Amino acid sequence: MSGTEFERRIALLFEDLGYRVRLTKTTGDFGADLVVTRRSEVMVVQTKRYATDHRVGVSAVQEVVAAAAVYGARSSMVVTNAHFTRAAQTLARANSVDLCDRESLIRMLAVARGATTKPAETTEQPWWKQTPPSRD
């Protein structure tokens, strides 16, 4: 799967979870691959598809922080099928950037697959940390 295809799949996943999604242009996106909105809250998302043994570094976090300012987003996230370096985690915490690594992405997919309705508007936990519903 290419990076562009990964971007599109993440966009579909956000839509499945009840978000309006806009894909940004391929070049000149200011560090955001997706702009997602729910209840007028805007979040920018940077997607990074790599080999699973690769670690996403600080540049992805820096890009999405810049993108949040450009797009007027209140929150930002980096989504990857791999993992993050410690430096990226530290920078993300300092800038309130959510990181969605391989394990979080798997949970997110499980929530989307198990959801018969969109996420509750009052959910305390972010959707990517929710426990998937039971399949009994």
Predicted regions span which residues?
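Mixed-charge (Asp/Glu-Lys/Arg
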Residues: 1-30, 35-136
